[in-house]
């Protein structure tokens, strides 16, 4: 699907300021970091629950279809608890050739527990990656596009750290077009998953995380804007495919 649109040259947030969660846009990053720090111990369970436990297969399949192979140097942005990295390792990627970047110390702690010590994990934001130019063959991002501040800066950084011919894969959840599907998805994410999470761990952060997750999905810019921003950042062969109407895979080449 190639539904790009023209964009003005200004900072491009993935969604409006969500003032029901933080007082001002400047407070957004601190809120997000704190939210993920608190929810980190339960994040893998939440991810599995939201996807009916298909998330691990979907990540691995997406990476393979986008062209990730052994011998490549991988950067996983907004790496979280390391689920994308684990999927890459299952495909034969050398752990010593993998770098993960995330702004949440809590998520990085979970990541370190999951993956080999030879994986490099760095604290940092996608819009200002702590990585040298033209370093990686592949950049991945799993379900974190909605949590950055500026898509243009993010994609510019992707382009900067990739080698010529390098590839990008962005996995994301997209707001369903069907009204029925929209209501079902809202109920599942805002009511059912938080309730089960509370019964399971008594962690209030799980409910808060799901409320925020849903808000970012409901308010996220449409796919056409994301595709156009990738093209404007210098990427070619930009495309989007979907699974089940709500799971989007954005791929592009440097």
Question: Predicted segments — roles?
Answer:
Residues 52-72, 87:
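Conserved alpha-helix/loop element of class I SAM-dependent methyltransferases that forms part
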Residues 73-128:
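Class I SAM-dependent methyltransferase SAM/SAH-binding core
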Residues 101, 175-229, 233, 239:
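C-terminal alpha-helical "lid/dimerization" subdomain adjacent to the S-adenosyl-L-methionine
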Residues 127-138:
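A short acidic, Gly/Pro-enriched loop at the edge of an enzyme's catalytic core
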Residues 137-151:
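A short SAM/SAH-binding and catalytic strip from SAM-dependent methyltransferases
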Residues 152-164:
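A short glycine-rich, Lys/Arg-flanked "PGG" loop and its adjoining helix->strand segment in the class I
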Residues 166-173:
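Conserved beta-strand signature within the Rossmann-like core of class I S-adenosyl-L-methionine
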Residues 233-254:
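Core SAM-dependent methyltransferase catalytic element
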């Amino acid at each position: 699907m190639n539904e790009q649109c023209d964009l003005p040259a200004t900072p491009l947030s993935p969604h409006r300021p969500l003032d029901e969660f933080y007082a001002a846009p400047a407070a957004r990053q601190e809120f997000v970091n704190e939210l993920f720090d608190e929810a980190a111990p339960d994040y893998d369970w939440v991810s599995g629950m939201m996807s009916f436990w298909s998330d691990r297969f979907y990540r691995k399949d997406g990476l393979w279809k986008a062209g990730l192979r052994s011998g490549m140097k991988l950067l996983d942005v907004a790496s979280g608890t390391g689920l994308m990295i684990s999927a890459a390792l299952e495909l034969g990627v050398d752990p010593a050739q993998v770098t993960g970047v995330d702004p949440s110390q809590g998520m990085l702690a979970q990541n370190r527990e999951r993956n080999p010590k030879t994986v490099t994990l760095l604290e940092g934001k996608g819009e200002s990656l702590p990585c040298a130019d033209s370093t990686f063959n592949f950049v991945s991002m799993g379900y974190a596009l909605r949590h950055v501040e500026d898509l243009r800066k993010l994609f510019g950084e992707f382009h900067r750290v990739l080698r010529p011919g390098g590839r990008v894969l962005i996995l994301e959840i997209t707001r369903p077009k069907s009204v029925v599907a929209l209501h079902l998805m809202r109920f599942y994410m805002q009511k059912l998953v938080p309730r089960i999470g509370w019964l399971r761990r008594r962690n209030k952060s799980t409910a808060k995380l799901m409320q925020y997750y849903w808000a970012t999905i409901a308010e996220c810019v449409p796919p056409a804007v994301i595709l156009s921003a990738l093209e404007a950042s210098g990427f070619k062969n930009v495309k989007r495919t979907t699974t089940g109407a709500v799971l989007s895979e954005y791929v592009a080449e440097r």
